């Protein structure tokens, strides 16, 4: 850790290093975090993009703060899904980053349109059409990746919750898409596995989802202009956690919520371990690192 000394033009910074062996080869990973600047990364002492380090050292951390996965707002659960998606498929880091950039650009444009009129407003609306298309394409990819992950994670969460809690209630997950809600599609009953399978299947076709998002953005255009917010897309979706047939948020006890949050992290670990075994070379798989804080 480096702190800014009086009279010196050096920002606060910290360096994180990890030495590990992957595929029988030693690796040195370094990330330099600099206050007010972009992070820097090195792989085996050679400069690289931070995204290039993703997936090399797969790590799962459980901490008491993870109770927010059950209790808090949808953005916490979306971040959980997206972090795990990128850990499993590092190539999707670019899709996630591009999506967030386009979303921010579109948000800024919507806010700016409130102050525009005449030809300036017409020009801004034409630009909005361009951002709509880009956002729809990127959001569709992100949604499909999340749904695939939820399907992979679901049995591991159920198993991990049983192991942790020894309870009779079964843990379950459901991905809720703002796109389908905006198009009048009701959420199925959590007990109806066939209906949920159909619901999720409708989100796996990236081209179809992109087209549907673009159409829905057009239908919501006036409301978005009035409110200056993006009303539909991956950024409005949620992951609902169930114990039995009831959502854990609002119905589960503190102990049940704690066990479910831990089960989510343990399930992530088991999923990555299973994936490592499937993609191993010469049958030699490498387990991810599991860190449990205050369990």
Regions found by a protein language model. Name each.
Residues 47-56, 63-137, 177:
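A conserved P-loop NTPase coupling/switch region
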Residues 4-7, 119-292:
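Conserved NTPase motor "head" modules and their coupling/switch loops across ABC/AAA+ ATPases, GTPases
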Residues 1-68, 74-76, 80-92, 156-162, ...:
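Nucleotide-state sensing region of NTPase/ATPase domains
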Residues 25-27, 50, 115, 182, ...:
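Intrinsically disordered, low-complexity acidic/polar segments
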């Amino acid at each position: 850790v480096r702190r800014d000394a009086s009279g010196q033009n050096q920002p606060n910074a910290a360096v994180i290093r990890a030495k590990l062996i992957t595929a029988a080869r030693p690796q040195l990973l370094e990330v330099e975090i600099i206050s007010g600047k972009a992070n820097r990364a090195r792989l085996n002492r050679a400069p690289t993009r931070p995204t290039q380090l993703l997936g090399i050292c797969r790590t799962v951390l459980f901490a008491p703060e993870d109770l927010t996965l059950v209790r808090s707002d949808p953005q916490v659960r979306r971040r959980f899904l997206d972090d795990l998606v990128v850990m499993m498929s590092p190539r999707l880091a670019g899709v996630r980053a591009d999506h967030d950039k386009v979303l921010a650009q579109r948000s800024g444009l919507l806010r700016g349109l409130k102050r525009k009129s005449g030809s300036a407003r017409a020009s801004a609306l034409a630009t909005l059409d361009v951002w709509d298309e880009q956002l729809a394409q990127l959001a569709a990819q992100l949604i499909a990746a999340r749904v695939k992950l939820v399907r992979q994670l679901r049995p591991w969460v159920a198993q991990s919750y049983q192991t942790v809690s020894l309870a009779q209630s079964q843990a379950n997950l459901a991905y809720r898409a703002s796109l389908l809600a905006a198009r009048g599609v009701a959420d199925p009953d959590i007990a109806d596995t066939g209906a949920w399978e159909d619901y999720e299947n409708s989100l796996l076709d990236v081209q179809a989802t992109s087209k549907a998002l673009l159409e829905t953005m057009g239908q919501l255009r006036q409301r978005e202009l009035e409110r200056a917010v993006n009303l539909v897309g991956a950024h409005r979706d949620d992951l609902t956690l169930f114990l039995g047939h009831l959502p854990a948020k609002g119905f589960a006890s503190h102990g049940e919520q704690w066990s479910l949050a831990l089960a989510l992290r343990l399930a992530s670990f088991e999923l990555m371990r299973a994936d490592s075994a499937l993609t191993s070379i010469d049958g030699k798989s490498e387990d991810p690192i599991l860190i449990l804080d205050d369990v």
